[in-house]
Protein backbone atom coordinates (compact mmCIF):
# COMPACT_ATOMS: atom_id res chain seq x y z
CA UNK A 1 0.00 0.00 0.00
CA UNK A 2 2.92 2.34 0.68
CA UNK A 3 4.19 1.81 -2.87
CA UNK A 4 0.73 2.62 -4.26
CA UNK A 5 0.48 5.80 -2.20
CA UNK A 6 3.84 6.98 -3.51
CA UNK A 7 2.84 6.36 -7.12
CA UNK A 8 -0.60 7.93 -6.65
CA UNK A 9 0.84 11.05 -5.02
CA UNK A 10 2.99 11.74 -8.10
CA UNK A 11 -0.07 11.75 -10.40
CA UNK A 12 1.88 10.50 -13.39
CA UNK A 13 0.47 10.04 -16.88
CA UNK A 14 -0.86 6.75 -18.21
CA UNK A 15 1.43 4.20 -19.83
CA UNK A 16 0.92 2.28 -23.08
CA UNK A 17 -2.25 0.64 -21.73
CA UNK A 18 -3.91 4.03 -21.22
CA UNK A 19 -4.91 3.15 -17.64
CA UNK A 20 -4.74 6.06 -15.20
CA UNK A 21 -4.67 6.11 -11.41
CA UNK A 22 -8.19 7.55 -11.34
CA UNK A 23 -9.50 4.69 -13.48
CA UNK A 24 -8.02 2.08 -11.14
CA UNK A 25 -9.48 3.70 -8.04
CA UNK A 26 -12.90 4.14 -9.62
CA UNK A 27 -13.17 0.75 -11.33
CA UNK A 28 -14.99 -1.00 -8.44
CA UNK A 29 -18.44 -0.77 -6.90
CA UNK A 30 -17.26 1.81 -4.38
CA UNK A 31 -14.34 4.22 -4.04
CA UNK A 32 -11.87 1.62 -2.72
CA UNK A 33 -12.88 -1.75 -4.15
CA UNK A 34 -11.26 -1.02 -7.52
CA UNK A 35 -7.93 -0.32 -5.85
CA UNK A 36 -8.18 -3.39 -3.61
CA UNK A 37 -8.91 -5.65 -6.60
CA UNK A 38 -5.98 -4.13 -8.50
CA UNK A 39 -3.51 -4.68 -5.65
CA UNK A 40 -4.71 -8.23 -4.91
CA UNK A 41 -4.36 -9.24 -8.57
CA UNK A 42 -0.90 -7.65 -8.76
CA UNK A 43 0.15 -9.50 -5.62
CA UNK A 44 -0.98 -12.81 -7.14
CA UNK A 45 0.97 -12.13 -10.33
CA UNK A 46 4.14 -11.54 -8.33
CA UNK A 47 3.67 -14.54 -6.05
CA UNK A 48 2.90 -16.88 -8.95
CA UNK A 49 5.74 -15.36 -11.00
CA UNK A 50 3.32 -14.37 -13.78
CA UNK A 51 4.23 -10.70 -13.67
CA UNK A 52 5.61 -9.29 -16.91
CA UNK A 53 6.29 -5.56 -17.36
CA UNK A 54 4.51 -3.86 -20.22
CA UNK A 55 6.33 -1.71 -22.80
CA UNK A 56 7.35 1.80 -21.79
CA UNK A 57 5.71 4.75 -23.54
CA UNK A 58 8.30 7.25 -24.73
CA UNK A 59 7.57 10.97 -24.90
CA UNK A 60 9.86 13.94 -25.34
CA UNK A 61 10.01 17.02 -23.15
CA UNK A 62 11.83 20.25 -24.11
CA UNK A 63 15.16 21.07 -22.46
CA UNK A 64 16.45 24.54 -21.64
CA UNK A 65 18.82 24.49 -24.63
CA UNK A 66 15.97 23.81 -27.06
CA UNK A 67 16.71 20.10 -27.44
CA UNK A 68 14.35 17.31 -26.41
CA UNK A 69 14.84 14.90 -23.52
CA UNK A 70 13.38 11.38 -23.90
CA UNK A 71 11.13 10.35 -21.03
CA UNK A 72 9.90 6.81 -20.49
CA UNK A 73 6.48 6.36 -18.88
CA UNK A 74 5.80 2.86 -17.48
CA UNK A 75 2.26 1.70 -16.81
CA UNK A 76 0.74 2.32 -13.39
CA UNK A 77 1.10 -1.38 -12.54
CA UNK A 78 4.81 -1.36 -13.36
CA UNK A 79 5.33 1.85 -11.40
CA UNK A 80 3.77 0.26 -8.30
CA UNK A 81 6.05 -2.80 -8.52
CA UNK A 82 9.08 -0.56 -9.06
CA UNK A 83 8.11 1.57 -6.06
CA UNK A 84 7.78 -1.54 -3.88
CA UNK A 85 11.21 -2.73 -5.04
CA UNK A 86 12.64 0.71 -4.35
CA UNK A 87 11.36 0.58 -0.75
CA UNK A 88 13.38 -2.60 -0.23
CA UNK A 89 16.57 -1.69 -2.09
CA UNK A 90 17.03 1.96 -1.16
CA UNK A 91 17.97 1.36 2.53
CA UNK A 92 20.47 -1.31 1.46
CA UNK A 93 22.34 0.95 -0.94
CA UNK A 94 21.97 4.06 1.21
CA UNK A 95 24.26 2.33 3.69
CA UNK A 96 26.92 2.17 0.94
CA UNK A 97 26.60 5.57 -0.74
CA UNK A 98 29.24 8.17 0.07
CA UNK A 99 28.76 11.68 1.41
CA UNK A 100 29.87 13.23 -1.91
CA UNK A 101 26.61 12.07 -3.57
CA UNK A 102 23.53 14.31 -3.16
CA UNK A 103 21.07 13.57 -5.96
CA UNK A 104 17.89 11.47 -5.62
CA UNK A 105 18.65 10.43 -2.06
CA UNK A 106 16.53 10.72 1.10
CA UNK A 107 17.56 13.58 3.39
CA UNK A 108 19.83 14.93 0.62
CA UNK A 109 19.26 17.88 -1.67
CA UNK A 110 20.70 20.15 -4.33
CA UNK A 111 21.15 22.83 -1.65
CA UNK A 112 23.53 20.55 0.24
CA UNK A 113 25.56 19.95 -2.92
CA UNK A 114 25.80 23.70 -3.51
CA UNK A 115 26.86 24.31 0.08
CA UNK A 116 29.56 21.65 -0.34
CA UNK A 117 30.92 23.50 -3.37
CA UNK A 118 30.91 26.77 -1.44
CA UNK A 119 32.79 25.14 1.46
CA UNK A 120 35.37 23.60 -0.88
CA UNK A 121 35.96 26.93 -2.60
CA UNK A 122 36.40 28.61 0.77
CA UNK A 123 38.98 25.94 1.65
CA UNK A 124 41.02 26.81 -1.44
CA UNK A 125 39.81 24.19 -3.93
CA UNK A 126 39.36 26.70 -6.74
CA UNK A 127 40.42 24.70 -9.79
CA UNK A 128 37.37 22.77 -10.93
CA UNK A 129 36.95 20.00 -13.48
CA UNK A 130 33.35 20.56 -14.61
CA UNK A 131 32.29 17.39 -16.43
CA UNK A 132 29.24 16.63 -18.55
CA UNK A 133 28.17 13.04 -19.18
CA UNK A 134 26.46 12.63 -22.53
CA UNK A 135 23.05 10.95 -22.23
CA UNK A 136 23.96 9.23 -18.98
CA UNK A 137 20.62 7.55 -18.22
CA UNK A 138 20.39 6.18 -21.77
CA UNK A 139 23.98 4.91 -21.91
CA UNK A 140 24.41 2.79 -18.74
CA UNK A 141 25.64 -0.67 -19.84
CA UNK A 142 23.16 -3.29 -18.64
CA UNK A 143 25.68 -6.04 -17.88
CA UNK A 144 27.94 -3.77 -15.85
CA UNK A 145 24.97 -2.36 -13.94
CA UNK A 146 23.70 -5.86 -13.15
CA UNK A 147 27.19 -6.80 -11.93
CA UNK A 148 27.06 -3.85 -9.52
CA UNK A 149 23.65 -4.96 -8.27
CA UNK A 150 24.73 -8.57 -7.77
CA UNK A 151 27.39 -7.46 -5.30
CA UNK A 152 24.63 -6.45 -2.84
CA UNK A 153 21.54 -8.37 -3.98
CA UNK A 154 21.38 -12.15 -3.77
CA UNK A 155 17.65 -12.59 -4.43
CA UNK A 156 17.37 -13.86 -8.01
CA UNK A 157 13.73 -12.77 -8.25
CA UNK A 158 14.63 -9.14 -7.60
CA UNK A 159 17.54 -9.29 -10.04
CA UNK A 160 15.25 -10.79 -12.68
CA UNK A 161 12.71 -8.00 -12.15
CA UNK A 162 15.36 -5.33 -12.65
CA UNK A 163 16.72 -7.07 -15.75
CA UNK A 164 13.20 -7.21 -17.23
CA UNK A 165 12.65 -3.49 -16.59
CA UNK A 166 15.96 -2.63 -18.24
CA UNK A 167 15.13 -4.69 -21.33
CA UNK A 168 11.45 -3.74 -21.61
CA UNK A 169 10.57 -2.54 -25.14
CA UNK A 170 10.03 1.17 -25.66
CA UNK A 171 7.08 2.30 -27.80
CA UNK A 172 7.29 5.66 -29.51
CA UNK A 173 4.70 7.38 -31.69
CA UNK A 174 6.06 8.28 -35.13
CA UNK A 175 4.56 9.58 -38.38
CA UNK A 176 4.33 5.97 -39.57
CA UNK A 177 2.61 4.86 -36.36
CA UNK A 178 3.83 3.25 -33.11
CA UNK A 179 7.44 2.05 -33.24
CA UNK A 180 8.80 -0.51 -30.77
CA UNK A 181 12.50 -0.88 -29.91
CA UNK A 182 14.28 -3.00 -27.31
CA UNK A 183 17.00 -1.00 -25.53
CA UNK A 184 20.47 -2.54 -25.38
CA UNK A 185 21.67 -0.10 -22.73
CA UNK A 186 20.38 2.57 -20.37
CA UNK A 187 17.57 2.90 -17.87
CA UNK A 188 14.62 5.06 -18.98
CA UNK A 189 14.21 8.44 -17.34
CA UNK A 190 10.74 8.42 -15.84
CA UNK A 191 10.95 5.00 -14.24
CA UNK A 192 10.46 4.98 -10.47
CA UNK A 193 13.60 2.94 -9.85
CA UNK A 194 15.79 4.60 -12.51
CA UNK A 195 17.32 7.29 -10.22
CA UNK A 196 18.44 4.63 -7.72
CA UNK A 197 19.98 2.50 -10.48
CA UNK A 198 21.79 5.55 -11.85
CA UNK A 199 23.20 6.33 -8.40
CA UNK A 200 24.25 2.71 -7.85
CA UNK A 201 26.26 2.71 -11.06
CA UNK A 202 28.09 6.00 -10.41
CA UNK A 203 28.66 5.00 -6.78
CA UNK A 204 31.58 2.92 -8.04
CA UNK A 205 33.13 6.04 -9.51
CA UNK A 206 32.69 7.76 -6.12
CA UNK A 207 34.22 4.79 -4.36
CA UNK A 208 37.27 4.59 -6.63
CA UNK A 209 37.75 8.34 -6.25
CA UNK A 210 38.04 8.00 -2.47
CA UNK A 211 40.00 4.74 -2.40
CA UNK A 212 43.42 4.98 -0.78
CA UNK A 213 44.96 4.95 -4.26
CA UNK A 214 42.39 7.39 -5.69
CA UNK A 215 42.80 11.10 -6.51
CA UNK A 216 41.21 12.14 -3.21
CA UNK A 217 44.54 11.08 -1.68
CA UNK A 218 47.30 11.55 -4.26
CA UNK A 219 45.79 14.73 -5.80
CA UNK A 220 44.05 16.02 -2.64
CA UNK A 221 40.92 16.43 -4.76
CA UNK A 222 37.27 16.52 -3.71
CA UNK A 223 34.18 15.30 -5.52
CA UNK A 224 30.67 16.77 -5.44
CA UNK A 225 28.05 14.82 -7.40
CA UNK A 226 24.33 15.36 -7.93
CA UNK A 227 23.10 12.36 -9.98
CA UNK A 228 25.04 12.62 -13.27
CA UNK A 229 26.18 16.23 -12.68
CA UNK A 230 29.48 16.40 -10.84
CA UNK A 231 32.58 18.53 -10.32
CA UNK A 232 36.09 17.53 -9.24
CA UNK A 233 37.66 20.27 -7.14
CA UNK A 234 41.37 20.62 -6.37
CA UNK A 235 43.91 23.24 -5.44
CA UNK A 236 45.72 22.39 -8.67
CA UNK A 237 44.21 20.44 -11.56
CA UNK A 238 46.88 18.17 -13.02
CA UNK A 239 46.77 16.27 -16.34
CA UNK A 240 47.03 13.06 -14.32
CA UNK A 241 43.84 13.91 -12.41
CA UNK A 242 41.88 14.70 -15.57
CA UNK A 243 43.22 11.56 -17.25
CA UNK A 244 42.19 9.42 -14.25
CA UNK A 245 38.62 10.78 -14.26
CA UNK A 246 38.14 10.32 -18.00
CA UNK A 247 39.58 6.80 -18.06
CA UNK A 248 37.41 5.67 -15.15
CA UNK A 249 34.25 7.04 -16.73
CA UNK A 250 34.86 6.03 -20.34
CA UNK A 251 37.12 2.97 -20.26
CA UNK A 252 35.98 1.39 -17.00
CA UNK A 253 32.30 2.39 -16.74
CA UNK A 254 31.63 2.60 -20.49
CA UNK A 255 30.15 6.11 -20.36
CA UNK A 256 30.79 9.03 -22.70
CA UNK A 257 32.02 12.49 -21.70
CA UNK A 258 30.73 15.42 -23.72
CA UNK A 259 34.01 17.17 -24.51
CA UNK A 260 32.21 20.26 -25.83
CA UNK A 261 30.62 20.94 -22.43
CA UNK A 262 33.41 19.66 -20.18
CA UNK A 263 35.97 22.23 -19.03
CA UNK A 264 38.48 23.12 -16.36
CA UNK A 265 37.63 26.32 -14.49
CA UNK A 266 40.19 28.21 -12.43
CA UNK A 267 38.12 30.50 -10.23
CA UNK A 268 41.24 32.33 -9.07
CA UNK A 269 41.46 33.95 -12.52
CA UNK A 270 39.58 37.09 -13.49
CA UNK A 271 36.37 36.62 -15.45
CA UNK A 272 35.92 32.90 -14.70
CA UNK A 273 32.81 31.36 -13.21
CA UNK A 274 31.34 27.97 -12.41
CA UNK A 275 27.72 27.09 -13.21
CA UNK A 276 26.24 24.17 -11.27
CA UNK A 277 22.61 23.20 -10.62
CA UNK A 278 21.36 26.59 -11.77
CA UNK A 279 23.77 28.57 -9.57
CA UNK A 280 26.83 30.59 -10.53
CA UNK A 281 30.02 30.84 -8.47
CA UNK A 282 32.66 33.51 -9.08
CA UNK A 283 35.15 35.61 -7.15
CA UNK A 284 34.78 39.41 -7.12
CA UNK A 285 36.70 42.24 -5.55
CA UNK A 286 35.79 42.97 -1.96
CA UNK A 287 34.67 46.40 -0.75
CA UNK A 288 38.30 47.43 -0.23
CA UNK A 289 39.17 46.67 -3.85
CA UNK A 290 41.20 43.56 -3.14
CA UNK A 291 41.01 41.26 -6.15
CA UNK A 292 39.12 37.95 -6.09
CA UNK A 293 38.64 37.64 -2.31
CA UNK A 294 34.86 37.77 -2.23
CA UNK A 295 32.93 34.65 -3.26
CA UNK A 296 29.79 35.81 -5.04
CA UNK A 297 27.29 33.06 -5.72
CA UNK A 298 23.64 32.99 -6.59
CA UNK A 299 21.26 32.26 -9.50
CA UNK A 300 23.08 32.04 -12.83
CA UNK A 301 22.30 34.25 -15.81
CA UNK A 302 20.76 31.24 -17.54
CA UNK A 303 18.45 30.64 -14.57
CA UNK A 304 17.45 34.32 -14.57
CA UNK A 305 16.59 34.28 -18.28
CA UNK A 306 14.70 31.02 -17.92
CA UNK A 307 12.59 32.44 -15.09
CA UNK A 308 11.87 35.61 -17.07
CA UNK A 309 10.69 33.47 -19.98
CA UNK A 310 8.45 31.44 -17.66
CA UNK A 311 6.86 34.59 -16.19
CA UNK A 312 6.38 36.04 -19.67
CA UNK A 313 4.54 32.89 -20.73
CA UNK A 314 2.34 33.00 -17.60
CA UNK A 315 1.24 36.58 -18.37
CA UNK A 316 0.68 36.12 -22.10
CA UNK A 317 -2.36 37.65 -23.78
CA UNK A 318 -4.15 34.30 -23.97
CA UNK A 319 -4.67 34.50 -20.20
CA UNK A 320 -6.51 37.80 -20.50
CA UNK A 321 -9.84 36.28 -19.44
CA UNK A 322 -8.44 34.56 -16.34
CA UNK A 323 -9.64 36.35 -13.17
CA UNK A 324 -6.83 38.56 -11.90
CA UNK A 325 -6.84 37.04 -8.41
CA UNK A 326 -6.42 33.53 -9.82
CA UNK A 327 -3.63 34.64 -12.14
CA UNK A 328 -1.73 36.38 -9.34
CA UNK A 329 -2.19 33.38 -7.05
CA UNK A 330 -0.68 31.15 -9.75
CA UNK A 331 2.25 33.53 -10.29
CA UNK A 332 2.86 33.76 -6.54
CA UNK A 333 2.97 29.97 -6.18
CA UNK A 334 5.48 29.81 -9.01
CA UNK A 335 7.63 32.60 -7.53
CA UNK A 336 7.62 30.98 -4.08
CA UNK A 337 8.94 27.73 -5.48
CA UNK A 338 11.59 29.50 -7.53
CA UNK A 339 12.73 31.65 -4.60
CA UNK A 340 12.82 28.70 -2.22
CA UNK A 341 15.33 27.03 -4.51
CA UNK A 342 17.39 30.12 -5.37
CA UNK A 343 17.59 31.54 -1.84
CA UNK A 344 21.22 30.56 -1.24
CA UNK A 345 24.21 32.84 -1.63
CA UNK A 346 23.59 36.43 -2.68
CA UNK A 347 20.47 36.45 -4.88
CA UNK A 348 19.28 39.99 -4.07
CA UNK A 349 20.17 41.52 -7.46
CA UNK A 350 18.55 38.64 -9.34
CA UNK A 351 15.43 38.78 -7.16
CA UNK A 352 15.26 42.51 -7.89
CA UNK A 353 15.38 41.87 -11.65
CA UNK A 354 12.71 39.19 -11.37
CA UNK A 355 10.50 41.54 -9.34
CA UNK A 356 10.89 44.30 -11.92
CA UNK A 357 10.13 41.88 -14.75
CA UNK A 358 6.99 40.41 -13.19
CA UNK A 359 5.66 43.88 -12.31
CA UNK A 360 6.21 45.18 -15.84
CA UNK A 361 4.53 42.09 -17.27
CA UNK A 362 1.54 42.47 -14.93
CA UNK A 363 1.15 46.15 -15.83
CA UNK A 364 1.06 45.24 -19.52
CA UNK A 365 -1.39 42.47 -18.71
CA UNK A 366 -3.72 44.87 -16.87
CA UNK A 367 -3.58 47.42 -19.69
CA UNK A 368 -4.68 44.91 -22.34
CA UNK A 369 -7.38 43.09 -20.35
CA UNK A 370 -10.05 45.42 -21.72
CA UNK A 371 -10.62 47.57 -24.78
CA UNK A 372 -10.74 50.50 -22.40
CA UNK A 373 -7.35 51.57 -21.02
CA UNK A 374 -6.84 50.48 -17.42
CA UNK A 375 -6.76 53.49 -15.12
CA UNK A 376 -4.76 53.28 -11.93
CA UNK A 377 -6.43 54.89 -8.89
CA UNK A 378 -5.59 58.56 -8.49
CA UNK A 379 -2.69 59.16 -6.13
CA UNK A 380 -1.56 55.54 -6.31
CA UNK A 381 1.43 53.95 -8.04
CA UNK A 382 1.65 50.84 -10.14
CA UNK A 383 3.81 49.33 -7.43
CA UNK A 384 1.12 49.95 -4.79
CA UNK A 385 -1.69 48.71 -7.05
CA UNK A 386 0.08 45.42 -7.70
CA UNK A 387 0.90 45.04 -4.01
CA UNK A 388 -2.77 45.61 -3.12
CA UNK A 389 -3.72 42.94 -5.65
CA UNK A 390 -1.45 40.55 -3.73
CA UNK A 391 1.46 40.20 -6.16
CA UNK A 392 4.57 38.91 -4.40
CA UNK A 393 7.61 41.20 -4.17
CA UNK A 394 10.72 38.95 -4.37
CA UNK A 395 13.16 41.48 -2.90
CA UNK A 396 10.87 42.23 0.04
CA UNK A 397 10.46 38.52 0.76
CA UNK A 398 14.23 38.04 0.57
CA UNK A 399 15.00 40.93 2.94
CA UNK A 400 12.42 39.68 5.45
CA UNK A 401 13.84 36.15 5.28
CA UNK A 402 17.34 37.48 6.02
CA UNK A 403 16.02 39.17 9.13
CA UNK A 404 14.60 35.81 10.21
CA UNK A 405 17.23 33.26 9.11
CA UNK A 406 15.02 30.24 9.76
CA UNK A 407 12.02 31.61 7.88
CA UNK A 408 11.09 30.08 4.54
CA UNK A 409 8.79 31.29 1.82
CA UNK A 410 5.51 29.54 2.47
CA UNK A 411 3.89 27.48 -0.23
CA UNK A 412 4.80 24.52 -2.38
CA UNK A 413 8.37 24.70 -3.59
CA UNK A 414 8.78 23.17 -6.98
CA UNK A 415 12.03 23.61 -8.76
CA UNK A 416 13.87 21.58 -10.67
CA UNK A 417 16.42 18.77 -11.72
CA UNK A 418 13.60 18.45 -9.46
CA UNK A 419 14.39 19.87 -6.44
CA UNK A 420 16.83 20.60 -9.19
CA UNK A 421 16.47 23.39 -11.72
CA UNK A 422 14.93 22.40 -14.93
Model feature map: region roles:
Residues 163-167, 171-172, 253-321, 334:
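A conserved non-catalytic segment of reverse transcriptases
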Residues 1-48:
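Surface-exposed loop/turn segments and immediately adjacent short secondary-structure elements
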Residues 24, 74, 233-235:
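Short hydrophobic/aromatic beta-strand micro-patches
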Residues 53-59, 64, 166, 170-172, ...:
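Core structural elements
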Residues 359-361, 366-408:
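Extended C-terminal regions of large enzymes
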Residues 38-41, 45-59, 64, 96-268:
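Conserved polymerase palm-domain catalytic core
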Residues 181-187, 296, 312-327, 338-350, ...:
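Short, solvent-exposed helix-loop connector elements
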Amino acid sequence: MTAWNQVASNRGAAGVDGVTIQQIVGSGDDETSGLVDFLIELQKELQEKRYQPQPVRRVYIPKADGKLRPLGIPTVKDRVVQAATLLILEPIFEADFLDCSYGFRPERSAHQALEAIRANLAAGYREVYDADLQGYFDSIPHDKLMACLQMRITDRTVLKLIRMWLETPVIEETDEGPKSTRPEQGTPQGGVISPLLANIYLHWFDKCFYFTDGPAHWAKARLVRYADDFVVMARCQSPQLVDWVEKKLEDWLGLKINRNKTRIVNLSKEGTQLDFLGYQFRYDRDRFGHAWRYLNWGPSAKSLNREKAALTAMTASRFGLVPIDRLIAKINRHLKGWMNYFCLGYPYDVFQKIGHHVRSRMIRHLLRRSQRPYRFPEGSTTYRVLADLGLLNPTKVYVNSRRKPKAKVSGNAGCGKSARPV
